[in-house]
Amino acid sequence: MPMDPQEARLLDTQLAERLADTRLEAARLDESLAELLRDRADGTADDEHDPEGTPLSAEWSRMAGVREALTRSLHELEAARERLGAGGYGDCARCGRPIGAARLTARPTAELCIDCARRAESRRR
C-alpha cells in the first residue's frame, strides 16, 4: 500500500534530521582524527610505552572503526531517503513484500523484511 503523502513528508524530515546529525558527528570525528594524526606525526610522542594512558594507535583504531560505522549509517540513511522519494520505501529489496511497521520504526533504514534479513544473516555465518 502506498504511503500517505503527509506520513512520507514526516518520515523524510526525520530521515533528513538523522542524516544531518550523522554528518555532523562524522565531521567532528574527522576533526578528532586529523588532530590525532598530527599527534602521531610528532616524532617525540612515545605513547606506546606510557602506562598512564591509551596509546595513540589504539585510539586511532577505535576512532577509525567509529568513522566506518558512521559512513555506513550515512549510506543507509541516504538510500532510505532515495527509496522514499522513489516510492519503494517500506518494500523489501529482496522479496518485494512489505517490511512491517514495527521493523521500520525500530530501524528506519531497513531494506529487507525480517525474514529476508534473517536469511541473509544466516548465510553470513
Protein language model annotation of sequence segments:
Residues 94-95, 115:
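Short, cysteine/histidine-rich loop/knuckle motifs that typically chelate Zn2+
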Residues 99, 120:
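Cys/His-rich microdomains that often coordinate metals
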Residues 89-90, 110:
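Residues immediately within or flanking Cys/His clusters that coordinate Zn2+
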Residues 1-86, 124-125:
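Interaction interfaces in information-processing and related assembly proteins
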